[in-house]
């Protein structure tokens, strides 16, 4: 059996580490061609020692020099590259069959698009790719025969319970709606009067999942679920009015599909990203992920509730951007990334994140942008607007 040759973008993040854990369990099935790890050079060097990729990519020349020194010390022959073009190169290399797109934020878009242009199998964990450029990305993938497999636990759950021959037309398969579950994050029951004083350390402590700091804050505001709504819209060709969100604090049911006959099919499992990663990497097989069995005896009640927009205004803003379409999701994402970075840096309050996003969505912007240059230009304009607004909040 010829192993699948992988590029893993974002290998030092939580998704990347989980991917490598799954890969390590199946050395006969996978070979790592390239790893990309931004600035965590020590962790990336250790990964290179273990998986021996041809290439490792970091953010800039300074971090490249540090990584080269570590690899030379350890006798590892991996070639070091740096910069945005290097990400594109390792994602689109002829030797590569599959690309794990796990870079956080819109910065991951060009490399994901490059993989789509080369017809790769894309394991999509970077939700911003579809939020910012859904129409462009999906059309590029279709035109070049690229397979787009969702790694996000919610979308992967939907993917697992949709009919195998799903054509992207809900009515043909008797589908009434797609339901994304959300944990509600660490502040689901907190007093709203305390939200102004929430600290970054509090916001990144997710009750169920192990995630990076930015995504953890997005979970706390439920912007993460808002971005996932937009992602589901593009992945499954699902109209906005057929998408639902339900809060499920236990994170055991990862998402559901409601059918016209009254049936609801759900995917359940322990909250561990290795499950959706293994499902995508192993298709059409089911391969070992290293995740333990779900223990039904140990489960208490499974509970559900509707999201409260007063508690989670970012989710409401995401609904509005999805319904508006055009460049609105791009603006939503750029403003949120700028605001979350400012919050994590101690510049603004937790409640200022939604205020910043709302401000940017109220500005004038193009109704629709059809190329990556225009999308990245709008992204840059919105970030500048967000930074200017943040300056008024200090």
Curated annotation (Swiss-Prot):
InterPro entries membership: DXP_reductoisomerase, DXP_reductoisomerase_C, DXP_reductoisomerase_N, DXPR_C, DXPR_C_sf, NAD(P)-bd_dom_sf
Leading EC class: oxidoreductase
Record-linked SUPFAM superfamilies: 1-deoxy-D-xylulose-5-phosphate reductoisomerase, C-terminal domain (SSF69055), Glyceraldehyde-3-phosphate dehydrogenase-like, C-terminal domain (SSF55347), NAD(P)-binding Rossmann-fold domains (SSF51735)
Entry cofactors: Mg(2+); Mn(2+)
Annotated binding of NADPH, by residue: 12-15, 39-40, 126, 128, 212
Entry keyword annotation includes Oxidoreductase: yes
Alphabetized UniProt keyword annotations: Isoprene biosynthesis, Manganese, Metal-binding, NADP, Oxidoreductase
Pfam families, per database record: DXP_redisom_C, DXP_reductoisom, DXPR_C
GO terms of biological process kind: isopentenyl diphosphate biosynthetic process, methylerythritol 4-phosphate pathway involved in terpenoid biosynthetic process
Pathway membership: Isoprenoid biosynthesis; isopentenyl diphosphate biosynthesis via DXP pathway; isopentenyl diphosphate from 1-deoxy-D-xylulose 5-phosphate: step 1/6
Protein residues bound to 1-deoxy-D-xylulose 5-phosphate: 127, 153-154, 183, 206, 219, 224-225, 228
PANTHER family: 1-DEOXY-D-XYLULOSE 5-PHOSPHATE REDUCTOISOMERASE (PTHR30525), 1-DEOXY-D-XYLULOSE 5-PHOSPHATE REDUCTOISOMERASE, CHLOROPLASTIC (PTHR30525:SF0)
Function, as annotated: Catalyzes the NADPH-dependent rearrangement and reduction of 1-deoxy-D-xylulose-5-phosphate (DXP) to 2-C-methyl-D-erythritol 4-phosphate (MEP).
HAMAP family given in the database record: DXP_reductoisom
Record protein name field: 1-deoxy-D-xylulose 5-phosphate reductoisomerase
Organism of this sequence: Neisseria meningitidis serogroup A / serotype 4A (strain DSM 15465 / Z2491)
């Amino acid at each position: 059996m010829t192993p699948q040759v992988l590029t893993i973008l974002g290998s030092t993040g939580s998704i990347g580490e989980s991917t490598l854990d799954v890969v390590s369990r199946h050395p006969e099935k996978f070979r790592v061609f390239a790893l990309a790890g931004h600035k965590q050079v020590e962790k990336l060097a250790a990964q290179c020692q273990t998986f021996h990729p041809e290439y490792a990519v970091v953010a800039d020349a300074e971090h490249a020099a540090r990584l080269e020194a570590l690899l030379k010390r350890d006798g590892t022959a991996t070639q070091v590259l740096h910069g945005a073009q290097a990400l594109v190169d390792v994602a689109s290399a002829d030797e590569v069959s599959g690309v794990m797109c796990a870079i956080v934020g819109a910065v991951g878009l060009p490399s994901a698009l490059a993989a789509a242009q080369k017809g790769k199998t894309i394991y999509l964990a970077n939700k911003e790719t579809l939020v910012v450029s859904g129409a462009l990305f999906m059309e590029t993938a279709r035109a070049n025969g690229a397979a787009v497999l969702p790694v996000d636990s919610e979308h992967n759950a939907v993917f697992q319970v949709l009919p195998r021959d799903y054509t992207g037309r809900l009515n043909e398969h008797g589908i009434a709606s797609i339901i994304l579950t959300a944990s509600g994050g660490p502040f689901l029951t907190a007093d709203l009067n305390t939200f102004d004083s929430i600290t970054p350390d509090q916001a990144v402590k997710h009750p169920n999942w192990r995630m990076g700091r930015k995504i953890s804050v997005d979970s706390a505001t439920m912007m993460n679920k808002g971005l996932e709504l937009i992602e589901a819209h593009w992945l499954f060709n699902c109209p906005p009015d057929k998408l639902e969100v339900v809060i499920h604090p236990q994170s055991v049911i990862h998402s559901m599909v409601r059918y016209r006959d009254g049936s609801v099919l759900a995917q359940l499992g322990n909250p561990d990203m290795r499950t959706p990663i293994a499902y995508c990497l192993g298709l059409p097989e089911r391969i070992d992920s290293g995740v333990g069995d779900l223990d039904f005896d140990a489960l208490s009640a499974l509970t559900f509730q509707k999201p409260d927009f007063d508690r989670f205004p970012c989710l409401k803003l995401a609904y509005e951007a999805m319904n508006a379409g055009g460049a609105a999701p791009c603006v939503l994402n750029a403003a949120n990334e700028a605001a979350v970075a400012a919050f994590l840096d101690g510049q603004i309050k937790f409640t200022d994140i939604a205020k910043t996003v709302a401000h940017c969505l109220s500005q004038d912007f193009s109704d629709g942008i059809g190329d990556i240059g225009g999308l990245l230009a709008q992204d840059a304009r919105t970030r500048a607007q967000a930074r200017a607004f943040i300056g008024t909040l200090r």
